[in-house]
């Protein structure tokens, strides 16, 4: 039971205290400093606090987590003493915002990290003090840059601090926009892509970010917006400098469009220049070879020992059939040099002609360094999936897929290619079916990271595969007669065991096929091109044809040297044999005193 105050005394003190407390901080109660007495007998603490506020004509908001019972007599000279006493007894924390008294449990005290972009922590503190929200009892810890503030306190106090910070940021931002000018600049890209690139394979997709997206992530913590460029929706974000600052990608120009303050433009230029760098071109050829397990010795390969390469280095190739070696070493791959690979492929071609080997697939993929590339040759069949009330078709995809991300590692004059490889090879087993006649799919997945030296190839193998083929032979007409026809039919089953090899041949492409054709002596290569079985940088026949076309008369070779010099490239001549005379071949490279007919590239700035 509470004892109320005299109404006249209350009105006189109220007007006086309101004048004195207009600039006070939030920790002081601006209530009448008159005694408060309350006697409780097993009453709810919530009711006690609500009655306490009503006695002073004030609104009190009590947390739902306060559900204690109170017994005893409370006598205090002023309301703040009573509040401090009851808070220490029942582990409470209170906060007064000037109008409403909020009371919480100590366990409800939380922390917030406030990020400031336009203003500083000192400005936020001054704004809180001016508005009467500031409470020194609660935590306040800014960082050295004055842009991050760690605040702790009851929920209502944290809400007011965050609202004040947001209002201050908006006010500072509007003020800077009215006084600061904006500039617009276009930065064209030569090598990198301005917009994002999406790679689709099977049911997945991977987004390769462009330069615009990278800049947005680095320069901005703002919410991503959508900006339309050439009828394409491109994610954009406001930079930290201003809400009007934008970084946009223009796919038609392959350029970055920046709108921001002029003093920030050099920073954008430095970042874009650092990101717009040329990348090496890398070609990867994948050969999938099946070899009859009974004919492995025809390859000249001891699968438990290795391959003798051209440099007499022994290369061990582990297989799934060699359980002891796999258990001890755990490796399924190896590296071979060019001579060892040529020997292996020659034996594979011989076995293929005899029907004991088969090159299942040989895709070739060209990509840039650090750019993911995918080649997928697959088939899809659909299976009906029936539920309780619905039915749908589910696609089952299988085939050959090569996904890779290459990277060139250079140490001095030595170069290596780091390959992040994902190879998936699947096929439908013949004469096999599972539940409800659904065919069985055999799938082999290789996911690895390998470092391959210049001129080397990676062999991953061997994976044993058992194939069952069923053949039916019969006498015409007689074999179709019911019952009796069984005497004129014969069903035979043949089990064939093969070893599957994955041969990966990476290669750094300097100029490509078009460069070799441009350096030719003008002879007609159309007839020779028709005899080439494969148009790629991996084709031996094509390389021989192009190598012969480079041998030309001296005057033609000097014209090529002149053209190279105009393109800032040095070159020298070496002798070669033409049909009926000696010729000259142009070789790109730096000039040395020992080389003849050498033309150096002109120095920059010198005509």
Swiss-Prot record:
It comes from the Bacteria. Induction: The SctC complex is found in cells grown at 37 degrees Celsius, but not in cells grown at 23 degrees Celsius. Detectable in cells grown in the presence of Ca(2+), although less abundantly than in cells grown under Ca(2+) depletion. GO terms for molecular function: identical protein binding. It is found in: Cell outer membrane. Keywords: Cell outer membrane, Membrane, Plasmid, Protein transport, Signal, Translocation, Transport, Virulence. GO terms for biological process: protein secretion by the type III secretion system. Its main location: membrane. The secretion channel formed by SctC remains closed in the absence of the other components of the T3SS. The oligomeric secretin consists of an outer membrane ring connected via a thin cylindrical wall to a conical, periplasmic region that exposes N-terminal petals connected by flexible linkers. These petals harbor the binding site of YscD/SctD, a component of the inner membrane ring. The core secretion machinery of the T3SS is composed of approximately 20 different proteins, including cytoplasmic components, a base, an export apparatus and a needle. This subunit is part of the base, which anchors the injectisome in the bacterial cell envelope. Forms a stable homooligomeric complex. The complex is composed of 12 subunits. Interacts with the pilotin YscW/SctG, which is important for localization and efficient oligomerization of SctC. Interacts with the inner membrane ring inner protein YscD/SctD. HAMAP family: Type_III_secretin (MF_02219). Component of the type III secretion system (T3SS), also called injectisome, which is used to inject bacterial effector proteins into eukaryotic host cells. Forms a ring-shaped multimeric structure with an apparent central pore in the outer membrane. It may serve as an injectisome assembly platform. Essential for the export of Yop proteins. This is Type 3 secretion system secretin. The lineage of its organism: Bacteria, Pseudomonadati, Pseudomonadota, Gammaproteobacteria, Enterobacterales.
